[in-house]
Amino acid sequence: MIDQFERLPGIGPRTAQRLALHLLRQPEDQIRAFAEALLAARSQVGQCQTCFHLSAEPLCDICRDGTRCDQLLCVVADSRDLLALERTREYKGRYHVLGGLISPMDGIGPDMLQIPSLIQRVDRDGISEVILALTPSVEGDTTSLYLARLLKPFTQVSRIAYGLPVGSELEYADEVTLTRALEGRRAMQ
């Protein structure tokens, strides 16, 4: 059981051991309920037909929300990124989940992601702006450049700004982060 927990992202050996020991101390009915919840989630949760976010319904809550701005589309690599943006409660547009990033080193090409559906969606729905919210990595930059080139004939394309986290010290920031922070600077209001 410890080995299975260690396979989860962010779970190291000590945490895996703690989780396993905790479960072994639980009554059998609670363990059964936990196992059934895992199996039910796996069988009942799929992808939204429009944006490819996780959903138990054909359309996710965000795609069903009539108050969202239909002209603004934020592209993310996966549902974790979408959920992180939603936690800000600032973005009011729609999303498109790619299902990963272009990574030739890992054998992931554009055809393995939800890129064709993105192009169709932008063209079909008359999206006025696509916001690329992809990680500042080699794969994220590659995917962003690829998408920008494909989407510019159809719509305005922007990318979220990157910079220093709130409360951080300049002396500890790496050169790439500082460069992007300088490039993404804004006038004081």
From Swiss-Prot:
Domain Toprim: 71-165
Keywords: DNA damage, DNA recombination, DNA repair, Metal-binding, Zinc, Zinc-finger
MF annotations from Gene Ontology: DNA binding; zinc ion binding
Superkingdom, natural source: Bacteria
Zinc-finger in keyword set: yes
Pfam families: RecR_C, RecR_HhH, RecR_ZnF, Toprim_4
GO-annotated biological processes: DNA recombination; DNA repair
Presence of the UniProt keyword DNA repair in the record: yes
Gene3D superfamilies assigned: 3.40.1360.10, 6.10.250.240, RecR Domain 1 (1.10.8.420)
Stretches annotated zinc finger (C4-type): 48-63
Function: May play a role in DNA repair. It seems to be involved in an RecBC-independent recombinational process of DNA repair. It may act with RecF and RecO.
Family as reported in the entry's similarity comment: Belongs to the RecR family.
Protein name (Swiss-Prot/TrEMBL): Recombination protein RecR
Organism (species): Prochlorococcus marinus (strain MIT 9303)
